[in-house]
Amino acid sequence: MADRRNLFFFYGDDKAKLVEKMKPIYRILEENGFTILDHPKNANAIVSVGDDATFLQAVRKTGFREDCLYAGISTKDEISFYCDFHIDHVDIALQEITKNEIEVRKYPTIEVDVDGSTSFHCLNEFSLRSSIIKTFVVDVHVDNLYFETFRGDGLVVSTPTGSTAYNKSLRGAVVDPLIPCFQVSELASLNNNTYRTLGSPFILNHERTLTLKLRPDGNDYPVIGMDNEALSIKQVEKAVVRLSDKQIKTVKLKNNSFWEKVQRTFL
């Protein structure tokens, strides 16, 4: 981090108020040899100011850059999964940086291809949900194997870091980010003699390919979720999901591991 001194700050809500609060921090950073940029193009460190949702937006809006470090500053009551620093204690963060008390961790992403025409990455999860009050039908394939036919409200495919988010609310497993994999969870599946699914989340390793083929039954206009954004596509035939080679490098304090965050948040 000490060698990455071109900083771009990404703000969520209340930008004007937060920029004003960050001005003393800007001065401290500049006094310590950092340069504050107005555009992310020439930045080698991108800092989100807000919450985890702001961090996800910062990564997406700056193109999932692999040549940058990402860091999160929380403006909420406490630090969170993607925010290792708090806006009221950035001076402590600077001390940690100068003492080399921070580490760089890499978070995996998933790559999604929709009908061979639209592709994107997700840091947390990709979701495919019915856009109307009606179930839809999806044929699920793992690699070249037809695996199951799902009928229900939707499917969620999460990364290990995303396993603590939407996935966890669906009773999915919390997965260590050091394991290269992705997880598939169901939203209100209908199981009967015609449609039968595994009925539980399942985890695929980094070499697997997941293909979701929608049945053209009049409900093939789903809502596609990319982390905390929705993608507008009129009609979908299939979505292909893989674990991407692209990883996001983030800054972490040495005493703030993924499992310490899980413990602090849920236990």
Swiss-Prot record:
Which chemical reaction does it catalyze?
NAD(+) + ATP = ADP + NADP(+) + H(+)
Q: Which residues bind NAD(+)?
A: D52, A53, N124, E125, R151, D153, T164, A165, Y166, N167, K168, S169, A188
Q: Name one GO molecular function term.
A: ATP binding
The cofactor required is:
a divalent metal cation
Q: Name the residues annotated as catalytic in the UniProt entry.
A: D52 (proton acceptor)
In terms of InterPro entries, this protein maps to: ATP-NAD_kinase_N, ATP-NAD_kinase_PpnK-typ_C, NAD/diacylglycerol_kinase_sf, NADK
Task: List the keywords (alphabetical).
Answer: ATP-binding, Cytoplasm, Kinase, NAD, NADP, Nucleotide-binding, Transferase
Where is the protein found, in the record's own terms?
Cytoplasm
Give the chief site where it resides: cytoplasm
Q: EC number(s) for this protein?
A: 2.7.1.23
Q: Which enzyme class?
A: transferase
Family (UniProt): Belongs to the NAD kinase family.
NCBIfam families, per database record: PRK03501.1 (NF002902)
Name this protein carries in UniProt: NAD kinase 2
Task: List the gene name.
Answer: nadK2
